[in-house]
């Protein structure tokens, strides 16, 4: 049986590790709420932009619109935007996106297309740059804000927009993690370009808040209020022509779509990290319990052995 001191040192080490993982869980839980607040704050602009586009759509056919962002040309080159995080300790969050990107890349190559990658996040960059002989990398972005901002989305949008307008690529797809709940985050593929604006339909958000129960911090789930604004009047008059409006609004729409993908990915990363740290804390608690049992058994065996030696010596 292991030495008593070794077991005692392991117990101390496991308990210290549990303190760290528990602290990381609470930090991630608080940041999840911040990420959700960011999504909700950007929602009014997204909703109003969608309504304006819907209003314009009702007055004209997009097929007849003179906007390069809507033109569906023959597809030869497809750019994949892979959104991962800069850090680990978040379960399978980064690995799932990388696997989905590899699968999609192989699918497109097998169908005769010429795919390339735009990588967002250090984890994706590190993985695919180490395999640069297998994957064509167009651009990389790292060290974005933990809660993505419109500036982050704008820098990425300008890159992919320039490539699309110059016909260096014919289609742009973003691979990100859709935030479903704290325990469910799904890798998702969405086409960014060419645009097909049919409104922004969002399912009802879930709000998560820290609270206490039985002297323990827990997380409660609630539904976000849906503050629907009335639709724009159908008789509203625009000074500019529909084509001018589209050319001005569609880049904003594209940036908003990408920002939403970045925000959902950030929330998913934090939720995955919170879940991973919660599991690590539970495992550490169970391991400390088992080690304590082993320590007590070893101590009891040592005491029994000493008693036997004393009794044996007295008998002699």
Swiss-Prot record:
The keyword Cytoplasm does not apply. It is a peripheral membrane protein. GO terms for cellular component: plasma membrane-derived thylakoid membrane; proton-transporting ATP synthase complex. Keywords: ATP synthesis, CF(1), Hydrogen ion transport, Ion transport, Membrane, Thylakoid, Transport. InterPro entries: ATP_synth_F1_ATPase_gsu, ATP_synth_F1_gsu, ATP_synth_F1_gsu_CS. It is found in: Cellular thylakoid membrane. The keyword Metal-binding does not apply. It holds the Pfam family ATP-synt. Transmembrane segments: none annotated. Disulfide bonds: none annotated. F-type ATPases have 2 components, CF(1) - the catalytic core - and CF(0) - the membrane proton channel. CF(1) has five subunits: alpha(3), beta(3), gamma(1), delta(1), epsilon(1). CF(0) has three main subunits: a, b and c. Produces ATP from ADP in the presence of a proton gradient across the membrane. The gamma chain is believed to be important in regulating ATPase activity and the flow of protons through the CF(0) complex. Belongs to the ATPase gamma chain family. This is ATP synthase gamma chain. The lineage of its organism: Bacteria, Bacillati, Cyanobacteriota, Cyanophyceae, Synechococcales. The gene is atpG.
């Amino acid at each position: 049986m292991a030495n008593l001191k070794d077991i005692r040192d392991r117990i101390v080490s496991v308990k210290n590790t549990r303190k760290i993982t528990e602290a990381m869980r609470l930090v991630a839980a608080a940041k999840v709420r911040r990420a959700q607040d960011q999504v909700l704050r950007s929602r009014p602009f997204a909703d109003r932009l969608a309504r304006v586009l819907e209003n314009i759509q009702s007055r004209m056919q997009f097929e007849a619109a003179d906007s390069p962002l809507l033109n569906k040309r023959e597809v030869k080159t497809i750019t994949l935007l892979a959104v991962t995080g800069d850090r680990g300790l978040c379960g399978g969050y980064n690995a799932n996106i990388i696997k989905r990107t590899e699968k999609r890349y192989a699918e497109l190559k097998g169908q005769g297309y010429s795919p390339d990658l735009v990588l967002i996040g250090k984890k994706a960059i590190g993985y695919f740059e180490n395999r640069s002989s297998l994957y064509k990398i167009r651009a990389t972005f790292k060290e974005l804000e933990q809660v993505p901002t419109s500036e982050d989305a704008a820098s990425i949008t300008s890159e992919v927009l320039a490539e699309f307008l110059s016909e260096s690529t014919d289609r742009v797809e973003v691979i990100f993690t859709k935030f479903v709940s704290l325990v469910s985050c799904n890798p998702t593929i969405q086409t960014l370009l060419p645009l097909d604006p049919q409104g922004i339909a969002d399912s009802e958000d879930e709000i998560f808040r820290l609270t206490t129960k039985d002297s323990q911090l827990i997380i409660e789930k609630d539904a976000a209020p849906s503050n629907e604004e009335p639709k724009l009047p159908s008789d509203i008059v625009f000074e500019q022509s529909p084509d001018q409006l589209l050319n001005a609004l569609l880049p904003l729409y594209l940036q908003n779509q990408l920002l939403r993908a970045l925000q959902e990915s950030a929330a998913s990363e934090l939720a995955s990290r919170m879940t991973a740290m919660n599991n690590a804390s539970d495992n550490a608690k169970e391991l400390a319990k088992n080690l304590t049992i082993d320590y007590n058994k070893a101590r009891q065996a040592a005491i029994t052995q000493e008693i036997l030696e004393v009794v044996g010596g007295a008998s002699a």
